[in-house]
Amino acid sequence: GKEPQKGASAILQAARMITEIESRSVFGYLSFNCGRISGGTGANVIPDSCEFSIGIRYAANVQYEEAIAFLKNLCEHVTVPGTSCTMEQNGYYPAMEMVDGADRLLSLYQESCKLLGEPIPQGIQQSGCSDTSFVTRIGIPALCSLGIQGAGAHSLDEYAIPSSLLVQCKKLVATILAM
C-alpha cells in the first residue's frame, strides 16, 4: 500500500527463521529442510502471514528433542518488529535407535542372503522415518528397507521392480527360519 514502512513482513520473518534453521543442519547428526512455504497476497502488499513446514532428520531421539527446543526458542524470539510466531507439530516418528539383538538379527539376515547367493547387505544407520522405529523404541530389534527393490522413493519417478519381490521374500523367510 501507500505506507509500506508501517507494515511487518511475515515473509521476511519466516525467511530469517528458515535461514537460521537450515544453517543448523549437521548432516548425519541432525538436519532441517524447509520443504514448503506460503504467504502474502500480492507483490504490492506487506504480507501479514506466512507459514512454512520444516522436516527434521535425526538418528537419535535426543536429537529430536534438541531440535524441538531450538525451534521453540527461535519462535519465541522473532526479529522483525510487529511479527509473532506460532509452532505446530504435525507428526512424529521416533528415531530407529540400535537395540539389543539388532546385530544378531542383521547377522541372520546376512547369512540368509549368503545362503541364497544374494549380495550381502551392510547395516547402516541413517536419519529419516521408518515404521520400524516404533518397534525398536520398545526394545524389539528390527531391520528396515527389506521390501521390494526400486528407486525414486516418494517422488513422481518412484518405481518398483516386481521381479525382486520373490527374492526379497525368500531372504526374509530364510531369516525367520534361522531364528
Q: PLM features: residue spans?
A:
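Metal-dependent amide/peptide-bond hydrolase catalytic core
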Residues: 1-179
